[in-house]
Regions:
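Conserved ABC ATPase signature
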Residues: 148-153, 157
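The feature captures the beta-strand-to-loop junction immediately N-terminal to the Walker
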Residues: 41-43
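Q-loop/switch helix immediately C-terminal to the Walker
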Residues: 97, 104-118, 129
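Conserved ABC ATPase "signature" region
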Residues: 125-144
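ABC ATPase NBD coupling module
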Residues: 64, 76-92, 118
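A short, proline-enriched helix->beta-strand linker immediately N-terminal to the Walker B motif
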Residues: 168-172
Length: 173
């Protein structure tokens, strides 16, 4: 039987406030199999981002995953440096606000080419590869997007560029 890429079992995320602990997310469980998509839906402040941050090991300083188990490809998700080394290669996070992720001083082309280069794609093929990824996320004229800088993009366009960057990583999650 096929293993889930990600299993999040009975996760509880809590914040330490003075000498007390306040549960922010309680008893969340889900799994994602290869080829599946999962949407975390909830009101503002309901903990969707905290769940994603707990998977990536980047919770704010006074917040932690206090119980539950997270596994990635059948193994307990590592912590610390080992987990950080997986981010961007095996696990990619697409932020709600693409402008926060993109470097405003570098063209979209440069940012995509950097990601594509990490895949080992030959320099002569990077332009076509970048255009293909931008087309996959709905840009009718990817060549024009490559020439732009993040500040020239709308919020939705910036988010689609971050999705294209994630597709360039060929991460599992």
């Amino acid at each position: 039987m096929e293993k889930p890429i990600l299993q999040y079992n009975n996760g509880v995320v809590a914040a330490k406030l003075d000498r007390t602990e306040k549960e922010l997310v309680c008893g969340v469980s889900f799994h994602i199999f290869p080829g599946e998509s999962l949407a975390l839906i909830g009101e503002t402040g309901s903990g969707k981002t905290l769940i994603a941050q707990s998977i990536m090991g980047v919770l704010p300083g006074n917040v932690s995953l206090v119980s539950g188990e997270i596994s990635f490809c059948g193994n307990t998700l590592p912590k610390g440096k080992k987990l950080r080394s997986m981010l961007g290669r095996e696990i990619v996070y697409i932020p709600q606000n693409g402008h926060e992720f993109l470097d405003p001083s570098r063209s979209i082309r440069r940012q995509l080419f950097d990601s594509i280069g990490k895949l080992g794609v030959a320099p002569s093929l990077r332009y076509a590869f970048a255009c293909e990824k931008l087309a996959q996320v709905g840009f009718a004229q990817p060549e024009a997007i490559l020439k732009q800088y993040p500040f020239q993009l709308s919020g939705g366009m910036a988010q689609r560029v971050t999705i294209a960057l994630a597709l360039c990583s060929e991460a599992k999650l």
